[in-house]
A protein has these predicted regions:
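Exposed, interaction-prone extracellular/peripheral surfaces
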Residues: 4-139
């Protein structure tokens, strides 16, 4: 899906499957700040509709403001944040002290988002997507 793609409103397990299928085909592209994206799309969101953000929350200082704005407009915001710090640790040798500092910085970013009213999921590399999403659905 790209910014212009959307799914028609629906409910239930069928809609959940449609969402998961659409997310499976998503590929990152562009470098537009999240707040610019949410500002341009907010007119298409019904008041109170859930908004799902997949982001490492790194390198874009507009993420906290975008989340605050969405929550302030009455949206239920969920942030699924793949842990690039832990992934990087799996594939390279990050010195322990550097890892601890990066991990703490990441935790502070996620805590800020949670404090803004978003449900935040710290998605670890060893966790299946379905496991992470179960945290959202409350299973």
């Amino acid at each position: 899906m790209c910014i212009r793609d959307s799914l028609p409103p629906d409910t239930g397990d069928k809609q959940y499957f449609k969402i998961l299928s659409a997310l499976a085909g998503v590929r990152p592209k562009g470098a537009m700040p999240l707040q610019a994206v949410t500002n341009s799309l907010s007119g298409r969101f019904s008041r109170g509709s859930p908004v799902f953000i997949i982001s490492s929350c790194e390198g874009d200082g507009t993420v906290p403001a975008a989340v605050r704005d969405l929550v302030g407009r009455g949206h239920e915001v969920t942030v699924l944040s793949p842990s690039s710090v832990d992934f990087e640790r799996l594939v390279s040798r990050i010195p322990r002290m550097s890892y601890e500092v990066l991990k703490l910085e990441r935790q502070n970013r996620l805590t800020t988002l949670a404090g803004s009213g978003a449900q935040v999921i710290d998605w670890m590399p060893d966790m299946d997507l379905s496991q992470a999403l179960m945290q959202v659905r409350g299973y």
